[in-house]
């Protein structure tokens, strides 16, 4: 069974998904980050594939992408490192990247490497749902990889219902029209509007402290924290900075 599916069967609320950029703060950081987050009982880990032009991301994640690329991280290195820690990591791993990266690497090879690396799902925010349905859905289903869809405050009710039927296991709710890392800009009227959608939801963008985390937990099954986590982790004392942030956010 897909690990994301199993998680949502066994846990119905207060799900915490932590995002970080592969190859940041150093090219060798990822295994330690994964192990530490697992030991701290984080539910899902989302790993960003570094990209030179991350459209939806704010300053913090953009800088982590730049640093990661300078460190030598790329998709091949990412899969290599994930394969090395696969037997130690039991929590679901989701990769987040861009459609161009997916195509350039080779779609079939990308999905095969996901399976071999223990990845449970993919987020490709700029992959049009129509293209996914026509070209990739059968491949995803065959590989048992989840395809996660994002919705924003600008998503119409009609489109929202359609996307709810496409996504696997949960919807990624973008809490505002801002880029990632924007503090205290959560669109509460939007969260009220999607509250009754009968699909599990995780809220991201702007979840940075206990207050915003509690808002996410109120309106959805869980939250996604990215920029705040990346800002908090330090190369020189990586393990301690991870533990300090997680304990702060869930205290």
Swiss-Prot record:
EC number(s) from the headed UniProt entry: 4.2.1.20
One GO term describing the cellular component: cytosol
Record Gene3D superfamilies: Aldolase class I
Catalyzed chemical reaction(s): (1S,2R)-1-C-(indol-3-yl)glycerol 3-phosphate + L-serine = D-glyceraldehyde 3-phosphate + L-tryptophan + H2O
Enzyme class: lyase
Catalytic residues in the record: 46 (proton acceptor), 57 (proton acceptor)
Keywords: Amino-acid biosynthesis, Aromatic amino acid biosynthesis, Lyase, Tryptophan biosynthesis
GO function terms (MF aspect): tryptophan synthase activity
Pathway: Amino-acid biosynthesis; L-tryptophan biosynthesis; L-tryptophan from chorismate: step 5/5
Annotated family: Belongs to the TrpA family.
General function of this protein: The alpha subunit is responsible for the aldol cleavage of indoleglycerol phosphate to indole and glyceraldehyde 3-phosphate.
Quaternary structure, from the entry: Tetramer of two alpha and two beta chains.
Protein name: Tryptophan synthase alpha chain
């Amino acid at each position: 069974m897909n690990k994301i599916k199993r998680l949502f069967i066994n846990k119905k609320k207060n799900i915490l998904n932590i995002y970080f950029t592969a190859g940041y703060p150093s090219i060798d950081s990822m295994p330690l980050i994964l192990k530490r987050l697992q030991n701290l009982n984080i539910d899902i880990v989302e790993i960003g594939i570094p990209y030179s032009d991350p459209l939806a991301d704010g300053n913090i994640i953009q800088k982590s992408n730049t640093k990661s690329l300078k460190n030598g991280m790329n998709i091949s290195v990412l899969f290599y490192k994930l394969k090395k820690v696969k037997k130690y990591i039991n929590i679901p791993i989701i990769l987040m990247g861009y459609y161009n990266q997916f195509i350039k690497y080779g779609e079939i090879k990308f999905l095969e490497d996901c399976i071999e690396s223990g990845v449970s799902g993919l987020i490709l925010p700029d992959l049009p749902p129509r293209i996914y349905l026509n070209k990739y859905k059968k491949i995803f289903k065959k590989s048992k990889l989840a395809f996660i869809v994002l919705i924003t405050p600008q998503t119409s009710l009609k489109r929202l219902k359609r996307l709810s039927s496409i996504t696997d296991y949960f919807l990624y709710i973008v809490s505002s029209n801002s880029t990632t890392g924007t503090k205290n800009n959560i669109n509460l009227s939007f969260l009220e509007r999607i509250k009754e959608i009968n699909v599990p939801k995780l809220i991201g963008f702007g979840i940075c402290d206990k207050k915003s985390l509690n808002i996410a937990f109120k309106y959805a099954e869980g939250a996604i924290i990215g920029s705040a986590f990346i800002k908090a982790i330090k190369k020189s004392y990586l393990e301690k900075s991870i533990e300090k942030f997680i304990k702060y956010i869930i205290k």
